[in-house]
């Protein structure tokens, strides 16, 4: 965390983020941002700890940024979900009591959900065998979780290799598979607010949506209910498979998902060359009115930015307001900001998630 965990200072820290976003978007005539706050504690649904040996025992540990040698021992973690905090001492007691579970265990990862699901990944510097699997199965049953053991590129799965999340958007509950090791939004309460904002911002449409960087379908599912059809792109195989499962589970049947990068999609739309992965998809049949982007921290590269310019509306979720501002600067001659928002995904840090709806001038 970049700032001390202090719930009493939360409002002050949030005000500073709002001021920073206003400052970055002021050159573009942005309206006042809608602000979506976070729970003050127990908001983070995932956590990762190294294990540190001290006084003959292994402890949960984290490290200060830039210092991998001075461990900060962790007994509880108030920013993490209540489920993670409840699991931490029970898991620690299990590895301390069991040679099979504790031997050469060096890292533990927790993933929980608002729906009450939980998964624990245990990482080892040794091969895992049947003896480990027997004890891990007992552990999973005792804790009511899925357990995954990892060792040198191999993994053993006890239960499922994904957690199930359920999010309510405009009165409809969407179910999501969140695969082990894949990206998920860490702050479930704020993610739900973010989905609701995007759902409202796009409005009820009679045309089509193009989505870049769709991940596991976090935004795809609710936004698909607002448009005629969706073409969504993603390059991660794990995320693509999760998104396909999520579409099927939620009976969302107006989405085509293709494994293409933004650069490849640009080439396809410009008819530079054909792609086998687009076989059976007629790009000319789509009437894209909106493009939705949720890029990595680096923002959109200049070519992707130019791709979005051809659309009347650009719905942009950003995890880095500086690169968001840089992208808007590239687009401001053709698009204006109609609405914007700040989502406090990461309390007690300088990081913020933001969203803008850009509309053609």
Curated annotation (Swiss-Prot):
Its EC number is 2.1.1.-, 2.1.1.35. HAMAP family: RNA_methyltr_TrmA. Dual-specificity methyltransferase that catalyzes the formation of 5-methyluridine at position 54 (m5U54) in all tRNAs, and that of position 341 (m5U341) in tmRNA (transfer-mRNA). Gene3D superfamilies: 2.40.50.1070, Vaccinia Virus protein VP39 (3.40.50.150). One of its GO terms (cellular component) is cytosol. Keywords: Methyltransferase, S-adenosyl-L-methionine, Transferase, tRNA processing. GO terms for biological process: tRNA methylation. GO terms for molecular function: rRNA binding; tRNA (uracil(54)-C5)-methyltransferase activity, S-adenosyl methionine-dependent; tRNA binding. This is tRNA/tmRNA (uracil-C(5))-methyltransferase. The gene is trmA. Belongs to the class I-like SAM-binding methyltransferase superfamily. RNA M5U methyltransferase family. TrmA subfamily. S-adenosyl-L-methionine binds at residues 185, 213, 218, 234, 294. The active site is at 319 (nucleophile), 353 (proton acceptor). It catalyses: uridine(54) in tRNA + S-adenosyl-L-methionine = 5-methyluridine(54) in tRNA + S-adenosyl-L-homocysteine + H(+); uridine(341) in tmRNA + S-adenosyl-L-methionine = 5-methyluridine(341) in tmRNA + S-adenosyl-L-homocysteine + H(+). NCBIfam families: trmA_only. PANTHER family: TRNA/TMRNA (URACIL-C(5))-METHYLTRANSFERASE (PTHR47790), TRNA_TMRNA (URACIL-C(5))-METHYLTRANSFERASE (PTHR47790:SF2). It comes from Pseudomonas putida (strain GB-1).
């Amino acid at each position: 965390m970049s700032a001390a965990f202090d719930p009493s200072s939360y409002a002050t820290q949030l005000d500073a983020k709002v001021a920073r976003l206003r400052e970055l978007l002021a050159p573009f005539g942005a309206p006042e941002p809608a602000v979506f706050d976070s729970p003050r504690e127990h908001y983070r649904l995932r956590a990762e700890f190294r294990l540190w040996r001290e006084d003959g025992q292994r402890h949960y540990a984290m490290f200060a940024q830039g210092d991998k040698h001075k461990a900060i021992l962790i007994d509880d973690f108030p920013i993490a979900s209540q489920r993670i905090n409840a699991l931490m001492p029970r898991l620690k007691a299990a590895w301390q009591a069991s040679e099979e579970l504790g031997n050469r265990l060096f890292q533990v990862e927790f993933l929980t959900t608002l729906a009450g699901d939980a998964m624990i990944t245990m990482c080892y510097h040794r091969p895992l065998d049947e003896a480990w699997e027997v004890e891990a199965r007992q552990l999973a049953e005792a804790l009511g979780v899925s357990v995954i053991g990892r060792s040198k590129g191999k993994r053993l799965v006890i239960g499922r290799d994904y957690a199930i999340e359920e999010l309510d958007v405009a009165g409809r509950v969407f179910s999501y598979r969140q695969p082990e090791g894949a990206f998920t939004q860490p702050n479930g309460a704020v993610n739900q607010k973010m989905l609701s904002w995007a759902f409202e911002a796009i409005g009820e449409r009679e045309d089509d949506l193009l989505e870049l960087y769709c991940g596991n379908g976090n935004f795809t599912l609710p936004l698909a209910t607002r448009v005629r059809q969706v073409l969504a792109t993603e390059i991660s195989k794990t995320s693509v498979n999760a998104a396909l499962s999520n579409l099927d589970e939620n009976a969302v049947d107006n989405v085509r998902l293709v494994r293409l990068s933004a650069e490849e999609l640009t080439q396809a739309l410009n008819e530079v060359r054909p792609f086998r992965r687009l076989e059976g998809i007629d790009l000319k049949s789509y009437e894209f009115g909106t493009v939705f982007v949720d890029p990595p921290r680096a923002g959109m590269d200049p070519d992707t930015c130019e791709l979005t310019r051809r659309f009347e509306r650009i719905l942009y979720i950003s995890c880095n307001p500086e690169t968001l501002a840089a992208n808007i600067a590239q687009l401001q001659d053709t698009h204006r900001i109609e609405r914007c928002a700040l989502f406090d995904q990461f309390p007690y840090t300088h990081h913020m998630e933001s969203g803008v709806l850009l509309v053609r001038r």
